[in-house]
Amino acid sequence: MASRAKTRRSCGVGFSICKAFAEAGVARIAIVSRSPEPLEKARAELAEAWPATQILTYQGSVTDSARMTDILQQLSTVDVLVMCAAIVHNRAPATKLSTEDVQTSFDTNVLATFNLTKAYLATPMPASGSKTVINVSSAAAQVSHTRRAAYGASKAAAAQLLQCFATERDSEAVRIFSFHPGAFYTPAVAEHFSRDEIQWDDVELPAHFARWLAGPESGFLNGRYLWAHWDVDELIALKDRLAKDPAFLTIGLVL
């Protein structure tokens, strides 16, 4: 039975990814969120639209490692783990950030990612014979942003950790990806930007990209950092270069 587990984020990317997998006909989707009301709303909408897919919901924070491990044990086997949960500190110069801002960013965006990935990889192998980890990251991991210093650093650190997990695993059995989902006009974004300031993305963009990553064609991208905007045919055309250059499309130092 194909099974997908998602940790959600409030901007709608997580829910859109759930819908994309449901559209593909997966047998089971498990959603984890701290907030019970949005969690129940997501369950009801998905169950109504795709009655053939089992929708499971669990309340909990990704920072609660014991809770995440318990949920994975209850699910027993999971084909695909999608990590969407993240925390973004208030916009401020690095000199104005508090130690708590930095600590919270790293606890949620790095340590929770590490613990959840490690716990998932320790679960039994599903009948499909492979596991997939999809980390919904941010361009902040690559682009310096002085007003989001801890956020960007934490997203880069998480991507680096996952690259290490990827290099230590047989890519036929375990595939691990990180990707930038795009820019979305949410209520939080509206506090700082106008709708016509840039061209905003549709949440279906990362949803369908995540679904493609979970499919059979993406194995050659194991351990890579990607953007949802990239054309998959162009990525496939880079397969030989990726095989020859382990550092290509990864987070690291360029000299």
UniProtKB/Swiss-Prot annotation:
NADP(+) binds at K118, Y151, K155, T186. Belongs to the short-chain dehydrogenases/reductases (SDR) family. The active site is at S137 (proton donor), Y151 (proton donor), K155 (lowers pka of active site tyr). It comes from the Eukaryota. Pathway: Secondary metabolite biosynthesis. Short chain dehydrogenase/reductase; part of the gene cluster that mediates the biosynthesis of the dimeric xanthones cryptosporioptides. The pathway begins with the synthesis of atrochrysone thioester by the polyketide synthase dmx-nrPKS. The atrochrysone carboxyl ACP thioesterase dmxR1 then breaks the thioester bond and releases the atrochrysone carboxylic acid from dmx-nrPKS. Atrochrysone carboxylic acid is decarboxylated by the decarboxylase dmxR15, and oxidized by the anthrone oxygenase dmxR16 to yield emodin. Emodin is then reduced to emodin hydroquinone by the oxidoreductase dmxR7. PANTHER family: ALCOHOL DEHYDROGENASE. Disulfide bonds: none annotated. This is Short chain dehydrogenase/reductase dmxR3. It holds the Pfam family adh_short. It comes from Cryptosporiopsis sp. (strain 8999). One of its GO terms (molecular function) is oxidoreductase activity.
